[in-house]
Curated annotation (Swiss-Prot):
Source organism of the structure: Caenorhabditis briggsae
One BP annotation, GO: anatomical structure morphogenesis
Functional note: Transcription factor. Plays a role in embryogenesis and later development, perhaps acting redundantly with forkhead protein pes-1.
Keyword terms of this UniProt record: DNA-binding, Nucleus
Alphabetical list of SUPFAM superfamilies matching this protein: Winged helix' DNA-binding domain
Molecular function terms, GO-annotated: DNA-binding transcription factor activity, RNA polymerase II-specific; RNA polymerase II cis-regulatory region sequence-specific DNA binding
Annotated GO CC locations: nucleus
Chain intervals with Polar residues compositional bias: 42-61
Gene responsible for this protein: fkh-2
Cited CDD domains: FH_FOXG
Name of the protein: Forkhead box protein fkh-2
The entry's DNA-binding region: 101-196
Amino acid sequence: MARFSILDLCPDLVEKAMNVQNGLVSMQSTLQLQAQKDINDPCTSIDSTTDIMSNPANDNSDYLLDESVDDERSESTSSKDSKSPCSNSSDDKKPSSPNDKPPFSYNALIMMAIKNSPEKRLTLAGIYDYILTNYPFYRDNKQGWQNSIRHNLSLNKCFVKVPRNFDDPGKGNYWMLDATCEDEVFIGGATGKLRRRPSTLSRARMDAYKQYGAAAANLFPYFNPGLPPMPRTPFITTPPTAFLPRPMMPMPSLAPVFTQPELIQMYLNQQQGLFAKLQ
């Protein structure tokens, strides 16, 4: 009996199948190279590589205090876009101009204005003058930022409104820094926003606890969490007769529980009785 193969009968089909298989292998290798390129490329979006690599969050010990209100939506968007790591190298080498938008939040600008004033207090007009004098960017961009300054003065607890004295000529109240924020709040160098350090009182309490905590636990063992609770002697050993519980009443008997065969038999008996009555 003669032997033959599928290659002899349909050589064109076998050739097409081989071409398809080779194309799939080539496509798979191309996708792997593209994925590796996307991982190494800093311009690749985070969303496209979240299943491959993840970035750990930065752990900052300082507490972020700044929640600035920004009424300049278009300017804030453009500033975020300008900080993209995929920007052109010529843009990175471009020197910063005094007319560029400063990298500080509105709360940070207010704090700098008040701290640099001789009396450590300023009116709203004085804060405007400080910003316009030191940051020329806001001279040509007056839309929105003055409203943002007013909103942040009212919302941030670090800024306190002080009424003007009766013998002080002029208009408007003064704004000062709260005493608790003057030493504990600073401007972050990387973010340009207000951040809060741990308070001096909190650090002093923690240091005192570390130094005297063990000695206090030995002197007052009742406050030591490691010891078991002390037994308490009850004031009344036996309850009064008037408060003794009444005797329990007998519970009513429950309905009998039948099994499935018993229920079927009861049903058949009932049907037979009804059938006998009909006859």
